[in-house]
Amino acid sequence: MTDMTERVGTQVTFEELSALMKRTAGVHVEPPDLRARAEEGFDGFGLDSLGLLGIVAELEKKHGVGLPEQVERCKTPAEFLAQVNATLRTAV
């Protein structure tokens, strides 16, 4: 079970997203490259919608927070991180 204090002030970074992409979808992209190409579509990295769903599930499990449906429809890493981090900031 996730300790509630783990969630306070938590943000998902490009580094964490890169690791999740590799672990859940087998897509390897270095964090600096992901950051530099943050406005590029996930498909440009080889990540499909099922891979993104796997990342969402991992984040929900880790943070103990349900992420809104629109997170699953994000097209870019920048959009995804903005949506996820906004949700984590407001989660109690």
From Swiss-Prot:
Gene3D superfamilies registered for this protein in UniProt: ACP-like
Record keywords: Phosphopantetheine, Phosphoprotein
Signal sequence coordinates: none
Domain Carrier: 11-92
Keyword Methyltransferase among UniProt keywords: no
The keyword Phosphoprotein is assigned to this record: yes
Domain of life from the UniProt record: Bacteria
O-(pantetheine 4'-phosphoryl)serine: modified positions: S49
Xref: PROSITE patterns: CARRIER, PHOSPHOPANTETHEINE
Posttranslational modification: 4'-phosphopantetheine is transferred from CoA to a specific serine of the apo-ACP-like protein.
InterPro entries (UniProt xref): ACP-like_sf, PP-bd_ACP, Ppantetheine_attach_site
Role description: Involved in developmentally regulated synthesis of a compound biosynthetically related to polyketide antibiotics which is essential for spore color in Streptomyces halstedii.
Protein name: Probable acyl carrier protein
Organism of derivation: Streptomyces halstedii
Gene of this entry: sch3
